[in-house]
């Protein structure tokens, strides 16, 4: 089987190369925004008009004549920015993402080369079109044939992400166990075998410092040197928060994936669960402050990324991930199967009102998720996407985040 894998390395460019890379990233951003504006204008004139990469790519020479400095950027990188827009529209129509937005300077500055690059791992250097040879920190051995290179700027440092492809044998998972996983706010992940992974809450840890930095930024003169310095501090802190979260997720998913051949999770619609409860001017929302805190905790813990990592790591290890309907998983008694809201009146405790069974609520949820996974394997029960809602006791949530 073919395996695609990405490796990320820090680049060590010269000052001239840094200026050129900023220019190339800016050119790609301009082309992306012009293409999106053109597409929107065409759709306004004719609402049956569909996005076509070929049509927009044919406009690229005309844009280069209008803006001569676009000719300084590599043609491949400009074409790949149009490919990115094509992918954005494809994800939008597949309901995987929002409608494409215009790119802002300083956010996600990057460009990609699908060919024309060279890599010398033994010499710790990369050749990129129009940039020449660049040194990089060879922090890990790279396997496979390089397919493309994406150069990106983050926190003032340039990175090269190299996607590789290689043939591997169909893996066989060393374990034979199956486990249910329940994700939550108080506990990040609870397994049906009783193992618990506590929440790291990286944003909550740094929230006070972030607020202090943002208040200091508001007192600076915009675009002054002090403003830029303070802006850099905020960007670096956001990067630290993201790195703490990413590190914890990788360690957690690796541990679970290595020890269990089959993992059963809830098919949660994270985007729907983390929507704002403010409502509209005519119809105000309820428990807005509590819902805001819940949304912040869900996004802080990275439930979607947790599932994504589990799925690809299980595929690489020869295991599998089953997503089941989360409806009533935290309200069903695993002993007598009685379903009632009264079974779980608090965040932590589950007490069945019929048979008296009592246990930790998250553990009960994980046991029920495992049972639902067995039902899928035995009977082929399908997941109901439109009913994928996780039930949490409103009283406890309100008290915790009000």
Predicted segments with their positions:
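Long, hydrophobic, amphipathic alpha-helical segments used as structural scaffolds
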Residues: 36-43, 89, 93-100, 166, ...
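Gly/serine-rich nucleotide phosphate-binding loop at the start of the catalytic core
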Residues: 1-78
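Acidic carboxylate diad motif detector
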Residues: 54-157, 279, 296
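Short alpha-helical "patches" and their helix-cap loops
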Residues: 42-51, 98-107, 382, 386-389
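An alpha-helix initiation/capping motif
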Residues: 49-50, 54, 76-79, 83, ...
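Positively charged, helix-rich recognition surfaces that bind polyanionic ligands
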Residues: 5, 19, 130, 138, ...
